[in-house]
Every structure is written in structure tokens, then in C-alpha cells.
Amino acid sequence: MATVPTRSGSPRQLTTKQTGDAWEAQARRWLEGKGLRFIAANVNEPGGEIDLIMREGRTTVFIEVRYRRSALYGGAAASVTRSKQHKLLQTARLWLARHNGSFDTVDCRFDVVAFTGNEVEWIKDAFNDHS
């Protein structure tokens, strides 16, 4: 778990949520630097959450952000399991429906931004509804 200095100078532990939020914010800034445009963050639908939704040109990009301290056990990218992919697909399907769209009518893809230690890996089109 990450630490953050406090006013007293002694570090305090960040919660898992705070750590996740910090990495998601870093991913957003990094992707904006690559030309993507922010739409939404922490989108909740029954059964799941999407970390970031952004646009690249005409493509809606659903982004899962992962962080691991080290590559032990496969690193951050390996932690996006088939079960997690299914939840992301379902959540995106519901979000699109709420915005009058579907996988058939909206050009979209699923990316993973994986932070392992100090390394960042952007996996475009990491999976899809046909995987």
C-alpha cells in the first residue's frame, strides 16, 4: 500500500480506494497527453465499474487501470482476468444503453493501462465482446 506524507511529517497509509483513485488520475493525465479526451471516471452500473471512459477520435474507449508494485505473479496487466473482462463488457453494455447506444452502433474498444512498479503499459483493444 502507498504512503503519503501528512502535515506532521509522519506518513500515513493510503486506503486501497485512495491508491486506486491516484493511479486512475495518473492514467487519465497520461492518456490525455496521448490525445484521448476524458468522458467519465468510476462509472458504476449493476455488476461492475469502469475506471475511465475516454474518446480517441470517434472511438469510445473503456479503460481498466491496474497497478502492481512488481511483476511478481504476472504484473498489473495479468490481473485483468476473464471474469473481470466479462464484468467490464456488461458494465459498458449498460452504460452504452443509457446513452442510446450499443456495441452494434458505437465504435468502441477496451484498453488496459497497467502500472507495474515505475513502468506503464497501454494495451489497446486488450479484449472485446467476441473474446
Curated annotation (Swiss-Prot):
Protein name stated in the entry: UPF0102 protein YraN
UniProt cross-references to InterPro entries, sorted A to Z: Restrct_endonuc-II-like, tRNA_endonuc-like_dom_sf, UPF0102_YraN-like
Domain of life: Bacteria
Lineage: Bacteria, Pseudomonadati, Pseudomonadota, Gammaproteobacteria, Enterobacterales
Molecular functions (GO terms): nucleic acid binding
Regions of compositional bias (Polar residues) in chain numbering: 1-19
Pfam family, one: UPF0102
Region (Disordered) location: 1-21
Family statement drawn from the similarity comment of this UniProt entry: Belongs to the UPF0102 family.
Coiled-coil portions: none
